[in-house]
């Protein structure tokens, strides 16, 4: 979708995906290497998992209850200050104490819990969790259990997988982990405690999901099949597509494994996207006179997506449509454009009931492809926008509203009134630290707002640009202010593309 927007983003993605598993990159947005396994599923499908299932007789799975929320930032001082009960008594000023300060500063000075989401939180959590791992290994060795011989323990973030020869060993390992974790205020989730004899299958839903995924994949030719053909054919095979049967089987799967619904939806959308994305290697998706079949696939994708319309799944679905646009020319072909609009409107309930933050990229897509929603749907979205109080959502929706000049003027009036209100709410002291400042950095370069509103936004920023550089904080404020006051359409928010 962003290929037309920024070549640099695409180039970066292509280079990064050569180093990192592309599926992991698309699913998590993780632009780094995770070693040794990219995900739990890659671990449970590995040779190491199989070997442990053959070598050991007992298996157990436990996890830390509300792991990130339970991590006490002062625990990082305790990691290196032995016998320190009150963290204020910690005197060793090193990395662990700095971590404590940083974590509190990004969490409103609270020492309870790590912010869930940022990869920084996961990295910092590993410092503490690996400290516990080392203690457990040493304590078990002192009790006569040797890692790799008597047992194997694997941890993926807060999930712990235990293999041992006897149930007694398993119980001892769990007790040892529990004692070590309690020192840092971490507890087990008693509702997710699993014991079993090997070989063990953790994801019973996965086999059935793979079977359905394979059925979907049979609708397409594999690249190797096309490569070996004398007469080149499109990726999508000719013949009847039993969409209703696939939908029914999908519902049965979701109903059987309701707790895995998000993963099942992700699996099926990835299957469709992976097959459709083979187009990038120079293959056609459809025969020239059978492009109508595209809407059968899109309807299937929208149906699956409607069960879990999260941000990740939104990106996958939009990507499918953009791949198809090369052959269907939604913006130029009047019939295909109308079919796309009808398809989107048929699933209006997704946008009416979904989380706005998960749906925000749809608004930019709708603008690019001239897709107006139903008026009833827009009324619901407008109400949600007011409740969310999110400048990014307002910016995206303002872009969407441009499909009709009168509607755009209406939304713009609301936005300008909101901006003026936010400016008036910002105090003169430390505007950067105030929530309303997000509206300033989002809309300061907006090409649609009036001159008076733009001047009001700049009035918040200019004092920072002219303040004396008496300390590091003022220098940083000046850099930010000079960046925001540039006469450019693409700053914090890239208005120049729209």
Give, region by region, the residue ranges found by the protein language model.
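Amphipathic alpha-helical scaffolding segments
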Residues: 74-86, 130-131, 177-181, 196, ...
């Amino acid at each position: 979708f962003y290929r037309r927007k920024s070549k640099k983003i695409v180039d970066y993605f292509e280079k990064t995906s050569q180093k990192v598993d592309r599926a992991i990159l698309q699913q998590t947005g993780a632009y780094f290497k995770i070693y040794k396994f990219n995900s739990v599923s890659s671990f449970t499908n590995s040779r190491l998992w199989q070997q442990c299932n053959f070598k050991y007789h007992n298996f157990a799975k436990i996890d830390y209850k509300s792991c990130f929320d339970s991590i006490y930032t002062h625990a990082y001082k305790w990691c290196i200050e032995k016998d320190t009960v009150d963290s204020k008594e910690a005197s060793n000023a090193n990395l662990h104490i700095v971590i404590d300060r940083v974590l509190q500063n990004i969490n409103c000075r609270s020492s309870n819990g790590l912010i869930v989401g940022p990869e920084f939180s996961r990295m910092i959590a590993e410092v503490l969790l690996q400290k516990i791992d080392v203690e457990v290994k040493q304590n078990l060795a002192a009790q006569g259990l040797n890692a790799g011989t008597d047992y194997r323990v694997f941890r993926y973030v807060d999930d712990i997988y235990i293999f041992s020869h006897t149930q007694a060993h398993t119980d001892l390992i769990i007790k040892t982990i529990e004692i070590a974790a309690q020192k840092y205020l971490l507890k087990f989730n008693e509702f997710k405690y699993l014991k079993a004899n090997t070989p063990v299958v953790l994801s019973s839903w996965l086999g059935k999901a793979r079977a359905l995924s394979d059925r979907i994949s049979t609708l397409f030719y594999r690249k190797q099949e096309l490569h070996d053909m004398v007469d080149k054919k499109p990726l999508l095979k000719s013949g009847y597509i039993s969409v209703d049967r696939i939908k029914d089987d999908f519902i049965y799967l979701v109903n059987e494994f309701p707790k895995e619904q998000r993963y099942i939806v992700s699996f099926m959308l990835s299957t469709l996207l992976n097959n459709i994305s083979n187009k990038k290697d120079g293959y056609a998706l459809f025969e020239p006179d059978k492009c109508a079949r595209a809407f059968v696939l899109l309807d299937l994708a929208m149906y699956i997506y409607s069960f879990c319309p999260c941000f990740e799944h939104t990106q996958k679905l939009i990507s499918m449509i953009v791949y198809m646009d090369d052959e269907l020319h939604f913006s130029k072909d009047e019939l295909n454009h109308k079919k796309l609009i009808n398809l989107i409107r048929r699933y209006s309930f997704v946008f009416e009931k979904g989380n706005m933050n998960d749906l925000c990229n749809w608004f930019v897509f709708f603008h690019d492809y001239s897709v107006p929603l139903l008026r009833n749907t827009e009324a619901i979205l407008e109400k949600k926008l007011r409740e969310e109080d999110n400048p990014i959502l307002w910016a995206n929706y303002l872009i969407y509203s441009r499909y009709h000049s009168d509607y755009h003027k209406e939304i713009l009036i609301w936005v300008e009134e909101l901006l003026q209100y936010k400016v008036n709410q910002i105090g003169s002291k430390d505007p950067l630290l105030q929530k309303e400042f997000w509206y300033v950095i989002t809309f300061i370069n907006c090409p649609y707002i009036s001159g008076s509103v733009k001047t009001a936004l700049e009035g918040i920023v200019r004092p920072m640009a002219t303040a004396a550089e008496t300390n590091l904080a003022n220098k940083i404020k000046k850099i930010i202010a000079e960046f925001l006051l540039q006469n450019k359409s693409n700053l914090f928010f890239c208005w120049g593309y729209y």
